């Protein structure tokens, strides 16, 4: 006959023995080298083309030093980079001359110029975080799809910097009765230097 205290002691002994055996198994499993187990040592390597700079180049964006203009295309203040407004080559008014899809492509044109200006100032797109985008859309009075137009820029920044990481930004998308030289879209952005 077992007394209650003896039953608890045997249960404790069994649990303790089981823990010791599990610990031994973990030690044995951990003693194999990565080479023996067929696994590479260390963390997996990043796939080529995963840096923002390489992603942008993979999208076909060419980077070269820009000629100085009347104003600075990208200015640095502390750890922030502020771009000038970059107008699309596409001209016209959304809701009158152009469709939302055409406006979306015009916003991508602006994104390319923003990335070139940032690269020209900073020397690389790596090590940056997109903070804010301000998009201006040349709009007919009843046109209300400015956010869908500026998605063209945001989507490209997501492609380059990551939609849920460094490319995840705040944004304003506004309608204007006209833009300089009849441009369909003009966009400016703020970036943060992470390091």
Predicted regions and their residues:
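Compositionally biased regions
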Residues: 6, 16-18, 32-34, 38
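N-terminal presequence-like segments and the immediate start of the first folded domain
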Residues: 23-134, 139-195
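N-terminal secretory signal peptides that target proteins for export/translocation
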Residues: 1-12
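Sec-dependent N-terminal signal peptides
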Residues: 10-24
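Intrinsic structural disorder
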Residues: 1-3, 19-22, 51
